[in-house]
Amino acid sequence: DINKPSIIYWSIGNEDPLTSLHMVSVKLVKALDPTRPVLLPWRPEEWLPKEVDILAPHYWNPQEYDRLAGHSGRPVISTEYTHAYGNDAFGGLEARWKALTKHPAGAGAAVWMWADQGVKTPVRKKEKDLSEDEYLRINTAGWDGIVDSYRNFTRDYWETKAVYAPVYPAVDKISFVPGQDSVRIPIQNDFDFTNLSSVKMAWSVREDENVLYSGTDSMYGYPHTVSDFKLPVEKLVTVRPGRTYYVWFIFTDEKGTEITRRAVELCPQTEQLISVPVCRELLVTEADQVTIEAGDVRYVFSPKNGQLVSAELKGKQLIKDLYPAIWRKLNQGETSGFGKENLRKAVDLTHYTSSVTAWKVEKTPTNAVIRTTVDYRVDQENRFTVTYRYSIGVDGRLNVYYQILTKVAVPWLPIVGMSMQSVSGLDQVHWLGLGPYDAYPNKQAAPILGVWGGTAGSPDVTGIKAMRWMERSGSEGTIHVSNSGYMENDAMCPERTYILSGVFGRPEKGRRAEES
């Protein structure tokens, strides 16, 4: 075989009850090949006969892997875990892998599975709307590889590669004082036999989207140890307020093949005072609509629905609306996580009737504040209430605070946040956060910190992205939004961006994030 496969262990049966036939098979295999261990897939019991060399649990949660591997006298290999069902799930891989392999007994695990179990075939008339994909891999039961049937990489492939990387920074962020010579960044070596001296590190220190300086290094580090890399930071004498500083690492092996790439945030230990332009007057006009002007910036709010209906800069409209978002069409992974019973109860929570129950406008010399409460009624079983506080300062910045209280038939929501529609001319989207891949609370090993972007509605931008700030820009101007959460650009409506405080964690073939 051109791939030169190696037999690591012999596997007897699959997810079977333990019978005398299995033990006869185990003893026969060990007699034929006494050099390799034997396991029974799905059997993790510590009372198994001594002829079973390896314990092999399936689809456990991180706490269960931690408990077993922490005291097991036999190696533990999870011969199936983290089912790659669909292209929108695969949550929790990193937590399970680390819980298992942090112990000496945690010998490894195998995701289910490598490749989709079917040829990628066009479907002209779908009986079921399984996804937005025009192709189908046999059916949903065969749509479970980290690569498709043609070996094209999926998002899950990159997550697996990042989680399994044997070399990586042991921290996500580290502090420094501007002007100091260097900082020590711990590098973890999870190789069994390879010293870090054979691994090359290409690094670059960055300020937002800009590379400040870079270098290439190697270091000495024994297997299964942490060694410090001395990163020079003497060039970071001053830091600019409002900017994010971080270092990118790209690790490659002795053949030049990339192992992984990671980012470590560099946090300056100094007070950063952000100066903003201040206009001379804050003008508030109350009529059928409330208009608040601060210099060249103009905001328009509607007392009828409690929402921002327009934002303008120098007479040009940039934002057309801003309203709460707790629902959208569920993707394949989300439907598996919600389950059939909850899907039967689910309704489209975007179709509602709103009524304003409280509205108050306050003005001081330095800011204007609108406080409002709005009830949104879908039907008798589904409604929600949003309390808003819009605050606009003399610098023209709008701060939006909101609290969403729901009473709906389903126990979970796919998204929670605000939906913002910009004008069509703002077709470029950039964000500081994790990219370029989608990121979720329990699935964010592959994306790394940086500034990412592309054309609105394109594959570079669509999907759930972890963000700190995002910008929409174009011929009409620029919108800058700060948010420590997530964003989602709508491929069907590129002008719409969801600014989110929470998203539904990725399930793992029906097992929700909290269950797996």
Give names to the regions the model predicted.
Residues 187-191, 205, 233, 251, ...:
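Hydrophobic beta-strand positions in extracellular immunoglobulin-like domains
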Residues 237-242, 269-516:
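Beta-strand/loop-rich accessory regions of lumenal/periplasmic or secreted enzymes
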Residues 1-186, 190-197, 202, 207-210:
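Extended substrate-binding grooves/exosites of carbohydrate-active enzymes
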Residues 209-243:
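Intrinsically disordered, low-complexity Pro/Gly/Ser/Thr-rich segments with frequent PxxP/GP/PP motifs
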Residues 190-195, 255, 408-409:
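Short, acidic/polar linear motifs in exposed loop/turn regions
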Residues 236-274:
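Terminal connector regions
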